[in-house]
C-alpha cells in the first residue's frame, strides 16, 4: 500500500513543503484502474504506449505513478519505477536494484512554483517507504534546468558502463536516441546512519 498523501509531501526534515499563499496542490498515488488515471492520461498527455507500459509495471508492483493536482486538474506527474527498461538496462548492471524517478513532467503554466520538487520528494519518500536506500534518474545532457534542480535536491552524477553518458531510445516506430547522464541520491537520513 503506497504512503498517504501527507507522508508523500514531507521533505527529508519531516516538514510539509506546501505554499498556502498560492493554491494547495495535492499529490496522490494514481491507480491505473481508476477514473483518475484516465483523467491524468488526458490532462498530462500520456501516450497509449506509455500507458500500457505503466499498467504492466504497476500490476507487477514495479512502479507507482504520483500526480499533483491544482486548480481542479492534474498539473504534474512522475513515476517511481523499479526497472530501467530494455535499452537502459546498462544502468541495472552497474546499479542493480536501483529504482528510478521517471517521466517527471509539470504543465508549463505551473513550472517554477516548486511542484517538481514536491513530486521528486514524494517519489523519494515512496522509495524510502518501500525500503530503498538509494534512488536514481536519467537526465538529458542538454536539459540544464532539470540538472540544476536535481543537483539542488542532492543528486550527484555517476558513470554507467565506464562512461559519463548512456543512450536512451524513445519513440515508436522510429526511436530517437537521447544522451542521458545518471544521477543518484542516497535516501538515508542522518537518523538512519546512527
Regions found by a protein language model. Name each.
Residues 11-13, 19-108, 120-122, 126, ...:
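Acetyl-CoA-dependent GNAT
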Residues 81, 138, 161:
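Conserved residues at the C-terminal ends of beta-strands
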Residues 103, 107-121, 130, 141-148, ...:
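Conserved glycine-rich acetyl-CoA-binding loop
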Residues 54-69, 131-147:
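Generic detector of contiguous secondary-structure segments
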Residues 7-15, 19-23, 133, 140-147, ...:
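C-terminal "cap" of GNAT-fold acetyltransferases
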Residues 77, 158-160:
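Residue-level detector of high-confidence beta-strand sites
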